[in-house]
C-alpha cells in the first residue's frame, strides 16, 4: 500500500515538474518599455554598476563601467548584456536589438567614457 502511494505521488510530481518546465520555456520574458540608453541603464544596470558607473563591492563584485577599457569596442558589452556571465544575468531575451544597442552606446559614450563609434541594432543582431 505504502509503495503504491509513493509511486502515485512520484508520478504526479514528475508530471507537474515537466509541465512547469514547458510553461517556463514557452513563456516570453517581459520587455522593458524604455528605449533610450540612459533610461535603460538607470532601469536595469545602475542597481549593480551604480548610477555613475563606478561599480561596487558587496554581495558580489560589480565592475566599474566608468573608465573601463573593455568598452572600447562594442563586442564585449554586447556579449555581456546579451548572454551574461557569472553574476551578470543574460538580458538578451529581455531587451531587443535596438535597446541593447542604445545601452551599449550610452555606456561607451557616458559615465566618463568617450569611445569612438556607434553600435547599431544590426551589430547586436549579428552578435546574437
Regions from the language model: what does each represent?
Residues 1-5:
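Positively charged n-region of N-terminal signal peptides that target proteins for export
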Residues 33, 73, 77, 99-100:
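Stable alpha-helical elements in mature extracytoplasmic
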Residues 20-40, 56:
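Electrostatic cytochrome c docking/interface patches
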Residues 50, 54-94:
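Gly/Gly-Pro-rich "capping" loops immediately C-terminal to redox-active cysteine motifs
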Residues 21-29, 97-98, 102-128:
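Flexible coil segments in periplasmic/lumen-exposed cytochrome c-class electron-transfer proteins
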Residues 7-15:
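Bacterial N-terminal signal peptides
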Residues 37, 41-51, 103:
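The canonical Cys-X-X-Cys-His
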Amino acid at each position: 500500500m505504502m509503495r503504491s502511494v509513493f509511486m502515485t505521488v512520484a508520478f504526479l510530481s514528475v508530471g507537474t515538474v515537466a509541465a512547469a518546465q514547458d510553461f517556463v520555456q514557452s513563456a516570453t520574458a517581459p520587455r522593458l518599455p524604455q528605449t533610450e540608453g540612459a533610461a535603460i541603464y538607470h532601469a536595469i544596470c545602475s542597481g549593480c554598476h551604480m548610477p555613475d558607473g563606478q561599480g561596487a563591492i558587496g554581495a558580489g563584485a560589480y565592475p566599474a563601467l566608468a573608465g573601463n577599457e573593455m568598452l572600447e569596442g562594442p563586442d564585449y558589452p554586447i556579449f555581456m548584456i546579451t548572454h551574461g556571465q557569472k553574476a551578470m544575468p543574460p538580458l538578451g531575451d529581455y531587451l531587443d536589438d535596438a535597446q541593447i544597442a542604445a545601452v551599449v552606446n550610452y555606456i561607451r559614450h557616458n559615465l566618463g567614457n568617450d569611445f569612438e563609434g556607434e553600435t547599431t541594432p544590426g551589430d547586436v543582431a549579428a552578435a546574437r
